[in-house]
Amino acid sequence: MAGHSKWANIQHRKGRQDAKRGKLFTKAAKEIIIAAKGGGDPSMNPRLRAAIAAAKAVNLPKDKIEAAIRKGTGEDAGGDLTETFYEGYGPGGIAVMVEVATDNKNRTVAEVRHLFSKHGGSMGENGSVAWMFDRKGVISVEKSAYPEEKIMEAALEAGADDVIDDGEEWTIHTAMTDFTAVRDSLETAGIVMQSAELAMVPQNLVAVDADMGQKVLRLMDALDDNDDVQNVYANVDFPEDMPED
């Protein structure tokens, strides 16, 4: 899973930059708004529980979480968001899924299509690549911070599917229904998470060389920088020695 580690490390660095301009907070709040459309009680809404857990992992303040819930339930204005996925192919035929939360689908689909074309890819139809991914909980923990046994015990006993050695970090995969329980178990054990979110995890990775990896990364980066884009997923295995720029 070397490529996963490469993209995760890039995302973490981007995450620190995003946090400075509030983008991580915006993404977390949007996910809560959308999740809360299914009900504002986290105990009765598994997706809302997961969204709140992910928001806490990026330190979204409690008042912001509560405000997002009110928007999602319609108590406050500002909850007019539509969630959708756009699918397509990047350079080298890499499968790409783009998760968006938008108040104007026409604007967003045009922008996403333009970015695919600009960076050597193409948008596909619904279902064209989604079958290559599974929806899972994904939690990242700094590898050097805790003994392996502590991570394994806290994660697996709470129902995690797998704990993966991704170089500088442990990546924990869970079923959607077990995401909150695993996150809570790690927190109770005193383990600080770098990230905790629901994600589209590729079933298999496609290895690329450094040149092709750069092209795929530029597409993913451009999509990720769009204000309406929540997450970008691809079934790419980046080479370990690939420069980021």
UniProtKB/Swiss-Prot annotation:
InterPro entries associated with the record: Integrase-like_N, TACO1_YebC-like_2nd/3rd_dom, TACO1_YebC_N, Transcrip_reg_TACO1-like, Transcrip_reg_TACO1-like_dom3, YebC-like
Subcellular location: Cytoplasm
GO molecular function annotation: DNA binding
Membership in a protein family: Belongs to the TACO1 family.
Protein name: Probable transcriptional regulatory protein Ddes_0536
Species: Desulfovibrio desulfuricans (strain ATCC 27774 / DSM 6949 / MB)
GO BP term, pick one: regulation of DNA-templated transcription
Keyword Cell inner membrane among record annotations: no
Gene Ontology CC terms, in alphabetical order: cytosol
Region (Disordered) residue spans: 1-21
Stored HAMAP family: Transcrip_reg_TACO1 (MF_00693)
Pfam family, one: Transcrip_reg
Keywords: Cytoplasm, DNA-binding, Transcription, Transcription regulation
